[in-house]
Amino acid sequence: CTLALHGEDALDNLPTDQRLARYAQGNADNGLEELYFAFGRYLLAGCSRPGTLPANLQGIWNDDFHPAWDGKYTININTEMNYWPAEVTNLPEMHQPLFQMVKELSESAQGTARTLYDCRGWTVHHNTDLWRMAGPVDGASYVWPLGGAWLSQHLWQHYLYTGDQAFLQTAYPALKGAADFFLDFLVEHPKYGWMVCAPSMSPEQGPPGTGTMLTAGCTMDTQIVLDALTSVPVSYTHLRAHETSQDL
């Protein structure tokens, strides 16, 4: 998979740092954009091979006893972002380590959903690790139980790109479990009457002047819930499962 934007041949002879400096000043460089496209694919191919661990913020090499971000997976956007190129740039094989992690979390994190929220399904918060930790960590504002649902949408995206029915059959329990959690977790907004997540937050952001990141039914959470609750019935239809849509 390559990106052809037809840049100027003369710029290809410039060192990359000079091209970056030119680009930062507003000069067009289609060839540099092609190079960055290839660089993104290279990074994913270099740190997420089938049979290995998923890509994280730290990278695959570490010389510290206490690595950056503890070497964990930050799943309130960073892990997902690492894999945004996987399907669209034709690297589906590099998605496999993430799929394995999601499958394992969908099993281990059922206890988290049940114990912390008395909900069905499974849920993960903003961090996980080698041992598939699923509970909230760090400050109170990170009680954000939508990490699993967001991760699960990578399974659905892979199916949309590939049409692989066998894959969808194996992915369906994780997709359904992520959606089941919201059937029990959502509550009615006291002012508007909508069914929303509460507590809810857009990770690492908050309304100015409030002193908190917590709210009820923030836009990001609502979109994740919508994706989870709509992908499952469509999956069911595609698989011709032996369930009724009400059971989903």
Whereabouts are the PLM-identified features?
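Active-site lining segments of carbohydrate-active enzymes
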Residues: 22-27, 84, 90-146, 150, ...
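Alpha-helix capping and helix-loop boundary segments enriched in small/acidic/polar residues
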Residues: 27-28, 69-73, 86, 135-146, ...
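Acidic/His metal-coordination segments adjacent to aromatic residues that form catalytic metal sites
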Residues: 59-70, 125-142, 200-218
